[in-house]
């Protein structure tokens, strides 16, 4: 591999490192009991990599959550709620009450890696 190929590979690895850098812990709104407006914040532990807001009737839950477990069955089971609307996100204090209006979930780091890896392979194979 020539110098140019090494530079391209180094640049791509640097981009991956930026995507995967964990930095400081995620900060979420987190209240021990359902409430309509949670103002308490917490720094999530490393295994809880997203913030959750879930609404079941008039009860609104705010927690740190494992993004991998952000599915209806896991959320409803953990909160003991049969019907709810939920939202998981990966930015500081993103689980505020208005977040439920946006709906859906954000991309996980694994998904980003799965999208980036084919580009790395293609860049590597294109270099003579």
From Swiss-Prot:
Residues 26-108 form the UPAR/Ly6 domain. It comes from Aotus trivirgatus (Three-striped night monkey). Pfam families: CD59 (PF25152). N- and O-glycosylated. Glycans are attached at residue 43. Disulfide bonds join 28-51, 31-38, 44-64, 70-88, 89-94. It is a lipid-anchor; GPI-anchor. Interacts with T-cell surface antigen CD2. This is CD59 glycoprotein. One of its GO terms (cellular component) is side of membrane. GO terms for molecular function: complement binding. Residues 103-128 form a propeptide. Residues 1-25 form the signal peptide. Keywords: Cell membrane, Disulfide bond, Glycoprotein, GPI-anchor, Lipoprotein, Membrane, Secreted, Signal. It comes from the Eukaryota. GO terms for biological process: negative regulation of activation of membrane attack complex.
């Amino acid at each position: 591999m020539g110098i140019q190929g090494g530079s391209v590979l180094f640049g791509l690895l640097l981009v991956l490192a930026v995507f995967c850098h964990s930095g400081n812990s995620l900060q979420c709104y987190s209240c021990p009991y359902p409430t309509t407006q949670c103002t308490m914040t917490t720094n999530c532990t490393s295994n809880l990599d997203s913030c959750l807001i879930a609404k079941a009737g008039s009860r609104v839950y705010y927690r740190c959550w494992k993004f991998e477990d952000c599915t209806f069955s896991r959320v409803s089971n953990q909160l003991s709620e049969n019907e709810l609307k939920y939202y998981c996100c990966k930015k500081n204090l993103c689980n505020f009450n208005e977040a439920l209006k946006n709906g859906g979930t954000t991309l996980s780091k694994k998904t980003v890696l799965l999208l980036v890896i084919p580009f790395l392979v293609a860049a590597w194979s294109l270099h003579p």
